[in-house]
A protein has these predicted regions:
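Short, Lys/Arg-enriched N-terminal segment that forms or immediately precedes the first helix
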Residues: 3-20
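Short, cationic-aromatic polyanion-contact patches
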Residues: 16-26, 41, 72-96
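Key DNA-contact positions within bacterial/archaeal DNA-binding proteins
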Residues: 28, 54-55
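Pre-recognition alpha-helix immediately N-terminal to the DNA-recognition helix
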Residues: 29-33
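A short acidic, leucine-rich amphipathic alpha-helix
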Residues: 44-48, 63
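Glycine-centered, phosphate/nucleic-acid-interacting loop/turn motifs that mediate DNA/RNA or nucleotide
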Residues: 67
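Amphipathic alpha-helical dimerization/coiled-coil segments
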Residues: 90-121
Length: 121
């Protein structure tokens, strides 16, 4: 994917699957974009996903808090805002497996709650 390439139809399908697994759409788009490049900047993610800067920033904060993404400062000549490059810390397949494990845990909790609820009906 070049810096300005938009997400493909296949990418959008992956985004929808991630949303179905519980991620927000912005988080899913950002994650898919990151998975297609070894390293990228926020501006490149904005162009590829159609998200606005604040949306990408919030998604990156969440991905970094999950330890799925690392940030690297890029040296820039002159003044202005610093530029950061981002990359996934895990293969996308491991992130997907983490989401699957989390979903299974949630299902177990819901099933246990429903089982306990039946005792009161």
């Amino acid at each position: 994917m070049t810096a300005t390439a938009r997400l493909t139809r296949r990418d959008e399908t992956v985004v929808e699957l991630l949303v179905g697994a519980g991620l927000s759409k912005n988080l899913a788009k950002t994650l898919v974009c990151l998975s297609k490049r070894s390293e990228t900047t926020s501006v490149e993610i904005e162009k590829a996903t159609g998200l606005r800067q604040p949306e990408v920033s919030i998604a990156m904060q969440e991905l970094r808090s999950r330890k799925w993404v690392e940030k690297r400062d890029i040296k820039k000549e002159g003044k202005g805002r610093p530029v950061h490059a981002y990359h996934l810390t895990l293969p996308f397949s491991e992130i997907a497996e983490t989401l699957a494990r989390d979903a299974r845990k949630q299902i177990e909790v819901i099933e246990e709650n429903l089982k306990r609820l039946r005792q009161y009906t």
